Amino acid sequence: MTGIPLSATFNNIEVPPTEKNLDTFITHFKKLYDKGVRIVTIPHTLWMLTGRFQQAYPDVLVKNTILRNTQRPNEVVKQVEAGFHYINFDRDLMRDEDTLKRMQDAKKYCKDKLGVDVKYSLLANEGCWGNCPVQDEHFLYNNTRSKGNQPTYFQTAISYFSCPKWEEQDPAYHWRIANFPPWKEEWDRLLQYIDVIKMHGRESVSRIFETMDIIDRYRENKEILFRDFESYTQEINFAEKRIKAWREKIKTCKFDCWDCNVCDLITMKNNHVNLIDGVKNALRNAKNEKSKLSKETLYIPGLTSHKVKHFV
């Protein structure tokens, strides 16, 4: 026994919320219940509103699914009224501190008026585009595959026109993704507003290893929890003042990139400075006749001067 409770997840919101399907779910959940499962994710608020699951399994803690995109306090209250004990927020709230603060009022209301000490959870490291315009279509595709051996969304050609294309073409892509900021200090700030940090990895081997590494680094009180971030900023010589401005702005940016542009601005400014520094360095090395130029190329007759060859 590890002492870690097992949670069963049924989050396919494309399954019709019919009474027949509810009957099937209640009947077959007993197999898990009899094995000790006391936590479950249920996809439909309508099922909870009937009260039938709660009547059959009164001691089971029920979570909503993150696929319901819960973003507002009134949604929390209505879901708790329906019977949920644990709310998975939409991941975009990581950049909406104002709403996270307002959610504390809803939490207090649920405890004082409904007698439910509701728990909040926020996904930290899925690595997807913030406020993704095709998120629901991505989940729709995965949840409606008719055969078990059908490829998942990112294994299909059409998926290129979303995240893969944006990552390829947008210089600021990595500053826009819906991950918690990599500093432990920022994770602790967000923990003021939530009870549980939800970690990704169920569908990706590399992501599960990243998740375990983040947990280790948090336990070890490392300043930066994403191992690759520190080396990334050093490699591209990212200025600390720009990172500081970004950290402050994204607390409330809501992923409104069309109106904010902080990710574009810091990337453009940093790339511009690095380009100028690169040119200056190339000119200096050319003057000193330093480069990776081979002797064979250097002494090609009539090509150009040694200085220009080194510069090129």
Give the positions of each predicted feature.
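Active-site pocket-lining/capping segments in soluble small-molecule metabolic enzymes
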Residues: 1-75, 84-312
